[in-house]
Amino acid sequence: MKTLKMQRRVAAELLKCGENRIWIDPERVDDVASAITREDIRRLIKEGVIKKKPVKGQSRYRARIRHEQKKKGRHRGPGSRKGKKTARMGKKELWIKTIRALRKELRKLKEQKKIDRRTYRMLYIRAKGGQFKSKHQLYMFLEEHNLLKKR
């Protein structure tokens, strides 16, 4: 087997790819070995003796399957998580999610006449200040301070 290092390098330059992607016809190795100029290499490329192999891609098969599983909620447990809690959902996003839920609940209570306007305003401001982490905490506060009107 002849070494075709120089021919491979020149062909790689001409075909604008890496040396590993150069295919040389095993039947015509002697012709390639005798080619010493760039012009000779160009001629062999034209004849199809030297070709450029296609790029090897990265198969998405397993990734697609994993993605489908994740859509179903698999592979999302504590053992699969990397990074902080805030890396998965930002602090601001979490705040928006919480405050929207609280404000919606307060609006509902006001419309149902379970709390009056003054109580609503007081609770709204406290929610804005971050006193309640959840709707449950809001209801606990309402019960402790007897702020819910009985119908």
Curated annotation (Swiss-Prot):
Transmembrane segments: none annotated. Keywords: Ribonucleoprotein, Ribosomal protein, RNA-binding, rRNA-binding. One of its GO terms (molecular function) is large ribosomal subunit rRNA binding. It comes from the Archaea. CDD domains: Ribosomal_L19e (cd00481). InterPro entries: 60S_ribosomal_eL19_sf (IPR035970), Ribosomal_eL19 (IPR039547), Ribosomal_eL19_CS (IPR023638), Ribosomal_eL19_dom (IPR000196), Ribosomal_eL19_dom1 (IPR015972). SMART domains: Ribosomal_L19e. One of its GO terms (cellular component) is cytosolic large ribosomal subunit. Belongs to the eukaryotic ribosomal protein eL19 family. Part of the 50S ribosomal subunit. This is Large ribosomal subunit protein eL19. It comes from Pyrococcus abyssi (strain GE5 / Orsay).
